[in-house]
Amino acid sequence: MERAVQKLAVAKRLFEDGFYADAVSRAYYAMFYAARALLSEKSVYPKTHRGVISQFGLKFVKEGKFEKEIFDLFTRAQEDREEADYGLFSEIVEKEAKKIIEGAEKFLKECEKRR
């Protein structure tokens, strides 16, 4: 979880400096590392980003151990992260970046409760 917390701190700093796309990317990675940490406690080690999302959905959301609304923040962040990192003509605006960072804060808080 330490890595997740670090990524969230970086996301907030990037946001403050106006680097919204990079902030979204780091906020997503905060959620990604938090999800991996919880999955590792169940001895589940997916090799891909989609695998982490899929397994997290199966092991935590489907089993009723994690709210779907908060999990949806993770899936949305993954889509925005791909757009931020690979989209040639996309622009992540301040409002969207703020929403993703707030989602990452909620996601990490919920993950911490389950450790």
How should these model regions be labeled?
Residues 1-115:
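Terminal alpha-helical segments
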